[in-house]
């Protein structure tokens, strides 16, 4: 699914690097891997994550200096002010690019998408555990775009 989305957007790509690793690599490791493969990368996140950089992330300075950070401003977040009022973020400000996204995209969060995906995945597993094996293909039918009203 993601690969088909990327076909329409040449600047995007899908990598299975993190999935294939034995343990979950840190963001910095993933960015280094992609750089080794010849890709130019930056860390992209929403403004809700900006305050977490100091305490919730590892290798932040390395990521900022080696790759750069792109922060998507959401809702009425004043990212410039958030950075200015925080000494840690201010020290990284030259590496942070603020992107003001259109309002129709403010509600889109990758963490929420992952959460909903896991809920759906669990529901499919419950469905498969409940139904006879002959009906296990039902989940692909239920989630096919051809079977949804538009």
Question: Would you name each region that the model predicts?
Answer:
Residues 1-150:
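Nucleotidyltransferase catalytic core that binds NTPs
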């Amino acid at each position: 699914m993601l690969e088909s989305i990327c076909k329409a957007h040449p600047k995007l790509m899908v990598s299975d690097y993190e999935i294939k690793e034995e343990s979950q690599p840190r963001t910095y490791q993933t960015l280094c891997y992609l750089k080794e493969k010849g890709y130019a990368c930056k860390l992209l996140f929403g403004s809700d994550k900006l305050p977490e950089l100091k305490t919730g992330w590892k290798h932040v300075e390395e990521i900022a200096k080696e790759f750069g950070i792109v922060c998507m401003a959401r809702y009425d977040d004043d990212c410039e002010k958030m950075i200015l009022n925080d000494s840690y973020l201010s020290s990284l400000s030259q590496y942070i690019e603020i992107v003001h996204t259109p309002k129709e995209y403010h509600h889109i969060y990758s963490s929420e998408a992952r959460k909903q995906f896991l809920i759906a995945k669990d529901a499919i597993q419950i469905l498969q555990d409940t139904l006879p094996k002959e009906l296990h293909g039902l989940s692909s039918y239920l989630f096919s775009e051809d079977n949804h009203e538009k």
